[in-house]
Amino acid sequence: EVFIAVADFTVPKSGDLHSAGVPPVTLRAERRVAKFRVLLKDKPSPVNGFSFDMTAHTVQMLLTSKTEPFAEGIDALGGMYYGDPALYELPCCMSTMGDFHSSGTERYQMCQTNSTVFSPFVFADPASELPIGIVDIDISGASGGYTYKTDQTFARTLAASKISGIVFETTDTYDDSSSQIRIDVVEATDDAGNPENAAALFDPFYEWNASSY
């Protein structure tokens, strides 16, 4: 949790420039981080019955973001010289607890605050939002059990004091060329076929406190 509090106030002065004391000032602290939530849905695949086991899973992924060009100097004609847009890459590793938690009629594993590796958060400016890409997703469970992967790229937006995220479910597609079967996962959908909203499935207070004090 990272909160920032800023306030403008006037320091009164007496006639001889000594301070007459500062009146009470109220500071409102606001969260300056964005949270990213990963959920694993307990939904067996239609044919092979693949699912996530009731064990802690390690989730690894790469968050990417293209930044705006910035002025690096002045060119020969006196104009500003802008470099090429950069690409930020943030490797993330988190773990779920082994238990499933109910939301509506479905069950999910999530990265809880007391897990071995915490869910990631990113410092965020309340005045703007940050589009990100999610790539290189790899999920592993218990030793000797399944591992899970996807080659898809997912797009999300991070914003201060808000939770973004993604819900994964298993498919029937797998690779058994190694000692551990690797099962393909996709973004989970609801009964209507719409992508599930990770932020809406659980109360935000599950992971953090009130947005301000």
Give, region by region, the residue ranges found by the protein language model.
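Generic alpha-helix signal with a bias toward terminal, lower-confidence helices
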Residues: 39-41, 71-73, 170
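Tryptophan-paired
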Residues: 1, 45-164, 202-213
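Generic structural signal for short, flexible, solvent-exposed coil/loop and linker residues
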Residues: 25-27, 155-157, 169-174
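Beta-strand secondary-structure signal
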Residues: 24-26, 35-39, 134-136, 165-167, ...
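Short, low-hydrophobicity acidic/polar segments
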Residues: 1-35, 41-44
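Short stretches within intrinsically disordered, low-complexity N-terminal or propeptide regions
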Residues: 7-9, 78, 88, 190
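Intrinsically disordered, low-complexity repeat and linker tracts
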Residues: 169-213
